[in-house]
Amino acid sequence: MTTLEVVVVLITGDSAAAHSFGGFEFRSLAVPSRGSAEIAVWTVDVPEGGDGTPHRASKEEVFYVLSGSVTIQGQTASAGDAIVVPPNTELALTGGPARVLVATSVGIQGTLADGQTITPPWSL
């Protein structure tokens, strides 16, 4: 019988890299630069009256509201709710104040309304 060594990575919230974009604050949790190989997870703090940049994400995204409430495509989610957004669906995160946990696949890219494609730095 072969025994495989399993390596578990602890990523503390205090050590998460912080990024700002459009008045929103992102904190990278489980992303490739922190040890994740397939899944990317971060938090986003949405300010009161937050009006996110419209974009399309190349991968499915799951938004889990930790506190407050946000709206995506007319769907308002409060603490404990989740919104699943299929890939290539136009969306903008609005509302707040709120803290949201976002989960997606590694390699996600966003296409902005002007056609510019970006790789969100909080996903790396």
Predicted feature locations:
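A short, N-terminal "cap"/entry segment at the start of jelly-roll beta-barrel domains
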Residues: M1-E38, G115-L124
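A generic structural signal for short beta-strands and their flanking turns/coil linkers
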Residues: E25, A37-W42, K59-E61, L66-G68
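A short beta-strand-loop-beta hairpin characteristic of the jelly-roll/cupin
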Residues: H55-D81
